[in-house]
Amino acid sequence: MLCCHQMTESEKQEVCSWNYEGEYAVYNLPDYKTMQEKQMGFCNPNRDKNFFSYYDGEVLVGFTNLLEEESGVFVGIGVSPNLCSKGYGQQILSLVKERSFRLYPEKPLYLEVRCWNQRAVACYQRAGFAIEGQPFEQTTPMGKGSFYRMVCPAE
């Protein structure tokens, strides 16, 4: 069973060092110093309370960003590159769903995923998310791409 807690500075540094290969390299983050200087993602002091780390024993397996919005709750997820396709994404999303539906019981949970990333799409579908609507174009700090919005209804 995974455990989680609010993300620490040392965990942020570790996540910045993760190195995805091939087409997944689009998910590589800038170095920690750059993230801090630009106040990006979990290095933004106004948003860092939204980020959680997930452990399997002593191993950091992933992190999430959980952000309440007007009509739903956005979740961003990252799994350690050497632990992808080992079931951690589903385990993490199970914990995220529990937290989100406890804190925001009437709001659906949603995420955005690059259309080509069928590995992630399949993981999210197994975790109870479904593609909503048509793909859309979006530019992120990691580049431009075509994305699906996937939704998990409030329980």
Language model segments and positions:
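C-terminal "cap" of GNAT-fold acetyltransferases
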Residues: 106-110, 114-121, 126-130, 134-155
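Conserved acetyl-CoA pyrophosphate-binding loop and the N-cap/start of the following alpha-helix
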Residues: 83, 87-96
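Glycine-centered small-residue hotspots that permit tight backbone geometry or close packing
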Residues: 76-78, 87, 123, 133
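Acetyl-CoA-dependent GNAT
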Residues: 6-12, 17-84, 99, 103, ...
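Extreme N-terminal starter segment of soluble prokaryotic enzymes
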Residues: 1-2
